[in-house]
């Protein structure tokens, strides 16, 4: 579950299946990765995934104003079956694209930045 207010596909391939962004699919031969970019209504960013066989949840929470580049990366292949729930300060499209979109951030010399991400396993 990702309680975002906006979901955008990374590319045309992901756009073809955007209505299923929230579903885990069975492993599929020839599956091509799909990435979806999420925006949250406020600073309360979070995502959670449930594994019914283990009756276990993984929950992450973060400041979505600071880490404003949340990516859901899906690779539902037969051998490569992965879900990435990645909060970051940009999207994985390269600095040129982030600069164009106004998302490229800089640190001044000697400046540092601290982010907090909370990860919980709920059994």
Where are these regions (language model features)?
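Active-site pocket scaffolds in enzymes
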Residues: 48-123
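Active-site/ligand-binding surface loops and adjacent short beta/alpha elements
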Residues: 1-59
């Amino acid at each position: 579950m990702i309680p975002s207010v906006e979901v955008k596909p990374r590319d045309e391939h992901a756009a073809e299946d955007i209505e299923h962004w929230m579903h885990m699919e069975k492993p599929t031969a020839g599956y091509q990765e799909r990435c979806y970019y999420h925006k949250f209504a406020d600073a309360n960013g979070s995502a959670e995934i449930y594994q019914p066989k283990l009756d276990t949840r993984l929950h992450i929470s973060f400041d979505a104003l600071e880490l404003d580049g949340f990516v859901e990366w899906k690779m539902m292949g037969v051998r490569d079956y992965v879900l990435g729930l990645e909060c970051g300060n940009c999207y994985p499209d390269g600095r040129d694209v982030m600069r164009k979109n106004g998302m490229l951030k800089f640190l001044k010399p000697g400046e540092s930045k601290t982010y907090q991400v909370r990860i919980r396993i709920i059994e």
